[in-house]
Amino acid sequence: MKIIITGSEGLLGKEISQYLEQNHDIIKLDLLLGHDLTDEDFVRRWFSENTADCLVNCFALNDHVEAGKTRGTLFDISLESFKKFLDVNLTTLFSVCREFARNNKDGNIVNFSASTGIVSARPDLYNGGHKHPAYSISKAGVINLTKFLATHLAPQIRVNCIAPGGVEFDQDEKFKKVYSSLTPMKRMMKKNELNKLVEFLCSTDSSYMTGSTIIVDGGWTIW
């Protein structure tokens, strides 16, 4: 398969790319590679020149990149930052999916939501502060956008979504310990635990699935 991976240089994008490129033709899109997906003209032009069997959308604006900063309450959140999360995580995602669909007669789209797109982020994980609410709201929107696209692009293009829980990387040990204690599986997810699921959703093995959101969170959302 030829697979386009957006956000290919991020935590999950890089892991998924390295796994899939063992058996598939991978095309990488990422801001670090000079691809600005918030630029509508660029997105239109790029997808008109590049077709594929599957689009895997790993890109997202996530406030973990600001983990060193003190987290405030909802009264400290600027509307500018709120709008930016929605613009990148929803508006840009819609643009990318639309241009893939415009230029491919059939295929698959795999989007990424998050467990915080299903339930609210817990303040006790952030010392009483808040993970940015617009991140969670945007990830909830990804689930609905996936259903919308699946409805309107079927049967030619299937669209599904993965909602992962917290992925272990370089968080401080206190965060990992608290997160793990709040999850039935008592640990965070390893970054390679989504690889085969993504490949499954890209393949004909999932040929009767569309509009689905698969939760992979160690049971986080069942409590």
Where are these regions (language model features)?
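N-terminal Rossmann NAD(P)H-binding glycine-rich loop of SDR-like oxidoreductase domains
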Residues: T6-Q18
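Catalytic loop of short-chain dehydrogenase/reductase
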Residues: V110-A154
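Substrate-binding pocket helix/loop in short-chain dehydrogenase/reductase
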Residues: E66-K83, P123, Y179
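Catalytic Tyr-X3-Lys loop
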Residues: F75-S95, V110, Y135-I137, V142, ...
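Short C-terminal tail/terminal secondary-structure segment
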Residues: N127, E199, T210-W223
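Short, small/polar-rich loop/turn modules that mediate ligand/substrate recognition or access, typified
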Residues: A154-R158, M209-G211
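A conserved structural motif in NAD(P)-dependent oxidoreductases
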Residues: T183-L194, D205
